[in-house]
Amino acid sequence: SNSGKNDLLGELESNMKKTFRIKCFKLVLGVSLCFLIYLLVSLIIPPLIGTHEKSDTQAEVSITTSERVCLIDNNEDALLWRLRLIRSAQEEIILSTFDFRADSSGTDVIAALWGAAERGVQVRLIIDGINAQLHLSGSDVFQALAAHDNVEVKFYNPIRLTQLWTVNYRCHDKYLIIDRSTYLMGGRNTSDLFLGSGGTSRQNIDRDIVVYNGGFTTASANTLLEYFDRIWLLDTNRAFHAEAENH
């Protein structure tokens, strides 16, 4: 009968719609999983960049310098050196880091930077955009620091949905420059995982160096400053402005 045919056609159409919805759901789920895997892998694997010839990296260089170098192997000393250098600053502080967290050690650094800004020292911070967005931008103490008139903060290449292919362009630089002369550089981020005596159940083993020359700017300090200036002015950075009305 016509009624039976209509029922059959209706059921067939309903099944087709259901099958279509299932396929669409699987497609969206698959694309989402692929993107998530891509994002996670991008955070782990640095971009493959090779701009120097092998012969350049193996060249022997002889340099005579009056700079002095101090090696820092201990995580407690690493925090104390950062605080000591920040407190000694008279004109300018530059800090670049991949990961900065408002935990115990990170808050100590934030407090020292705030104290320097209160003394009239100009403070510039550049922090990798992914970690800053995940771990730092919502911190009240960091918001207070960023709202200070003498502090500028930039996030390096934060995630942009319109430029997902750049998600693995991360900034792993970790250095602290004081008054354009003395600087600390190494592999430690600014958090309990790398600094201090035990704000976390485990700590990374890493190393820093402090390079100084009695307050006089040297060739290596100038090279680092030039590099910082290039990174600071990149269009991929985003200035972080604290919500001053909350502080």
Q: Model-flagged regions — what are they?
A:
Residues 171-247:
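Signature of lipid phosphatidyltransferase scaffolds
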